Amino acid sequence: LYDIGSGCLLDTSEFDMTHEPTVQESVAAGVDLTFFSCDKLLGGPQAGVILGKKELISRLADHPLARAVRIDKLNLTALASTLIHYVKGEALTQIPIWRMISAPIEELKARVFRWHQSLTASSEIIQGYSTIGGGSLPGQTMPTWLLAIPGNGNKYSAAEIAKRLRRSDYPVIARIESDLSLIHISEP
């Protein structure tokens, strides 16, 4: 039995990150049953997969609890759609987590610059880091460019700015550091 956690299908070391065990490595190693999440680095719906030897999967499917924990049709469709992107070699362009991870640093800077130009509030562009996620690659960070809105240069504190951003018609989540509301522009 092997719980690989994130359900990663791509080699994270190709993106200057710590190597995360992949589903393919587990299967190639002959593990009887591999468990992994469908969200996180896989980029699909929140669900779990048990992958393994046919006779063991059959025994699990026959268990009375199998019906209670099986995936529903909507999540199964979402998972299938996600996996199709991997099969077609489109994961880096079609799956948001991989689009964010693989975005060139220059592209991130250009996005932040566009936001910076459109703001009426005092802001600056600074270098920083982004975390990948708590459940996948814990503690792993990547260099990025951030839009920094200072609390002391505006009418509100950084915490108040972050609160207003979260409650806006198009919510934006900011990280607060040193009285700055930091915004990572990960999607165009």
Please name every model-derived segment.
Residues N75-L76, A80-G133:
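Conserved PLP-dependent catalytic core of the aminotransferase class-I/II
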Residues S118-S178:
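Catalytic-core signal marking the mid-to-C-terminal active-site face
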Residues G5-S6, E55-A61, V87-I97, G139-P143, ...:
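Short acidic (Asp/Glu) and glycine-rich catalytic loops that position anionic groups and cofactors
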Residues D16-H19, K53, A68, D72-L76, ...:
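Generic structural signal for well-ordered, non-membrane alpha-helical segments
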Residues S181-P188:
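Residue-level detector of conserved catalytic or cofactor/ligand-binding positions
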Residues G52, I149-G153, S186:
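Short beta-strand-to-loop capping motifs
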Residues L1-Y86, T120:
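Conserved PLP-enzyme active-site core in the AAT-like
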